[in-house]
């Protein structure tokens, strides 16, 4: 792609005139859409993840200079969280219109799916913890398993369910087996309807080393499941700077362990955060998020 200029790529890929053109991913698609030469077309760029460095941000472009020029051509840049927004603007010293709009999820469909039965979940009086996502290193699953071992050893009545598949699965299974955790950790694999499981758990847990604006945590709030998470991009926006709608700890195994343990030690606090999850989940309804995007696309800057 770098052999062609953005304008050449645009002529090759986009054959019609459009009133609005959207680059919904950073990098290559932004390079293509920025090549639009029709000044009557509104150009919009979406940024989903923190880039951290100019090298990473400009990796799909010929140079740092080209990356700056391409992003400067957009009439509106949209970031999925304040963390992503601040990171993007810092790297580019960006002064063009740039706003935060949260990802749209199908809240009505999620709530309907959440009502289905989930017989795989044990009804034995133990608190159910839930983690969701690809089984890979960046999701922090090994430290979450370590936390469950500590809780088991301290006789806390908990059971962790994990939804997802991925390259870390064999290592996780080996750790569970070697530490005798089969009775307190269940890997559910990939499920077409994760919501029926999340909605019936007492606490959603995120141990990730890095995230964008977590769709899984958003969906947990929508179905009314409290969230306890390490601090990654977007979580304080979602749950409050002072834990108004959920618990955000520093990004370490010990801090997450203490956060979960505190909720287990104080059932009234867990019940409080369930109410807050329901309240906060309404902010991410399809109606609200779609309206915000429509307003951005059809309105002014």
Residue ranges of model-derived segments:
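An aromatic- and histidine-rich active-site surface loop
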Residues: 2-7, 20-40
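Short hydrophobic beta-strand element within catalytic cores of glycosyltransferases
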Residues: 226-229
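Membrane-proximal helix-turn-helix segments that form the acceptor-binding/catalytic region
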Residues: 7-16, 60-77
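Aromatic "clamp/platform" in nucleotide-sugar-dependent glycosyltransferases that forms part
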Residues: 190, 209
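Nucleotide-activated donor-binding/catalytic signature segment of Leloir-type glycosyltransferases, i.e.
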Residues: 173-189
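A conserved mid-protein helix/loop that constitutes part of the nucleotide-sugar donor-binding site
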Residues: 127-150, 167-173
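Conserved acidic donor-binding segment of nucleotide-sugar-dependent glycosyltransferases
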Residues: 241-253, 262-267
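Carbohydrate-associated surface elements
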Residues: 83, 104
């Amino acid at each position: 792609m770098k052999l062609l200029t953005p304008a050449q790529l645009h002529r090759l890929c986009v054959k019609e005139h459009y009133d609005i053109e959207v680059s919904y991913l950073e990098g290559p698609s932004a390079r293509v859409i920025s090549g639009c030469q029709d000044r009557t077309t509104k150009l919009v760029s979406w940024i989903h993840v923190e880039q951290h460095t100019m090298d990473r941000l400009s990796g799909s472009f010929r140079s740092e200079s080209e990356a700056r020029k391409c992003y400067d051509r957009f009439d509106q840049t949209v970031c999925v969280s304040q963390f992503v927004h601040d990171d993007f603007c810092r790297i580019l010293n960006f002064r063009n219109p740039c706003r935060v709009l949260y990802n749209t999820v199908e809240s009505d469909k999620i709530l309907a799916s959440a009502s289905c039965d989930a017989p795989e979940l044990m009804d034995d009086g133990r608190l159910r913890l839930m983690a969701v996502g690809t089984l890979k290193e960046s999701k922090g699953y090994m430290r979450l398993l370590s936390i469950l071992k500590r809780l088991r050893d301290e006789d806390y009545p908990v059971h962790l369910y994990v939804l997802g598949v991925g390259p870390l699965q064999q290592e996780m299974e080996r750790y569970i087996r070697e530490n005798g955790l089969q009775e307190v950790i269940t890997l559910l694999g990939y499920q077409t309807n994760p919501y029926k499981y999340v909605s019936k758990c007492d606490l959603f847990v995120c141990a990730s080393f890095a995230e964008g604006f977590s769709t899984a945590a958003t969906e947990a709030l929508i179905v009314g499941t409290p969230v306890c998470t390490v601090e990654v991009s977007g979580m304080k926006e979602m749950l409050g700077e002072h834990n108004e709608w959920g618990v955000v700890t520093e990004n370490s195994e010990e801090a997450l362990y203490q956060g979960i343990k505190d909720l287990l030690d104080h059932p009234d606090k867990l019940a409080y955060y369930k109410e807050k999850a329901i309240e906060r989940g309404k902010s991410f309804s399809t109606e609200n998020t779609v309206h915000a995007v429509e307003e951005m696309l059809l309105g002014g800057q």
